[in-house]
Amino acid sequence: MPDAAPRLKGLVEQMVGAPLPLRIRAWDGSEAGPPTAPTLVVRNRRALRRLLWKPGELGLARAWVAGDLDIDGDLYTALDLLAGIVWERGEDARTLAQALRDPEVRSAVRGLLRLAGPPLPPAPPREEARRPRRHLHTRSTDRRAISHHYDVGNDFYEIVLGPSMVYSCAYWPAPDSTLETAQRDKLELVCRKLALKPGQRLLDVGCGWGSLAIHAAREHGATVVGVTLSQEQAAYARKRVADEGLTDKAEIRVQDYRDVRDGPYDAISSIGMAEHVGAERYLEYATDLHRLLRPGGRLLNHQIARRPQRDESRYEVDAFIDSYVFPDGELQPIGMTVTQLERAGFEVRDVESIREHYALTLRRWVANLEADWGRATQLTGPGRARVWRLYMAASALAFEHNRIGVNQVLAVKTPESGMSGMPLRARTWN
């Protein structure tokens, strides 16, 4: 009689010391667990070997990406429930070592090893990037990291992002608004915060597929230079600019922001790009942007932030994100971002948290992906599509639960006269 699921349920509960909140369906067809809960589908024994070899986030991610694990039921509910039984990120080795001192845990591990069977360990899925020992953030490593994430295929991104082709947090007038409306409102918000006027020069750092460059040129009469490290993004953005008849107003370059030399600019936007800069390079990033602005020019820095830790020296990047999504990416608390911008010479004038907006945005992206799943897997492969579904759904929950946030920081290169040019009443953005 098939019994893998009840055996697995019992061993996991013995290990974690609590009831398993998910239902399990095992490779032999057996099921166990709460009948109304989402079902964790364990397709083969290899899934157990992945989790035993990397007991935590990375092992779970490898099993998911390879298709060894799946969820039958609401993905968001399942991820919330799983979060309570996965080893704490950044604490895997120490937490497991402490847990193994318990005879019950050791007995459960032995039982799981017998159930998993040989061999150990399975090779990581091919979608996993090679992780450097440390985050170098040289021009070459940044270029490779950007290519891993953004050169997946423009057709795939069209499915996920929709017609707006904006890959950053939208700005929602209401939860039931369309994604396209919310993204247009975000682009307009950025332009108003920068107080763009006809003829002014805007540098868009990390310009993506050109949406902000087009909006700023078409709606505000700005002359825009957009820079990206992604060849695919640049080709797509250039075609969009040409189709809009804006080639005299918007230029798209494949260029590192550190190599831009044609300042000064009246304004700089950096939307969802600074997460790739790295903590060690952040002051250099801020200093370079300060150098490129004219006195009185404004910077709008839109960036995801993590929560600060009591001991920052022990902070470790998310293993799944670093291996499968944003190799070499780093988040830092908003306080560190503001400090580094001011160290570079900026005067920070406004910080707006739009955390809930990103949760709404991510849920729409997941819905877009799921609605065209068959074509998405044809375009990029099932493993890569599974990476994206997991990463976006988990990120939506992280924003909803206040584990991470996103902020727009408006800063000014204030002239020696001290006249910032900002309105007396904040957030009128005139």
Roles of regions detected by a PLM:
Residues 304-419, 426-429:
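Substrate-binding/catalytic lobe of Class I Rossmann-like enzymes that use SAM or dcSAM, i.e.
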Residues 258-268:
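A short acidic, Gly/Pro-enriched loop at the edge of an enzyme's catalytic core
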Residues 197-206:
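Conserved class I S-adenosyl-L-methionine
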Residues 237-238:
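Conserved SAM-binding loop
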Residues 1-177, 182-183, 189:
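Feature captures hydrophobic
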Residues 283-295:
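A short glycine-rich, Lys/Arg-flanked "PGG" loop and its adjoining helix->strand segment in the class I
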Residues 296-304:
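Conserved beta-strand signature within the Rossmann-like core of class I S-adenosyl-L-methionine
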Residues 209-220:
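Conserved SAM-binding loop of SAM-dependent methyltransferases across substrates and taxa
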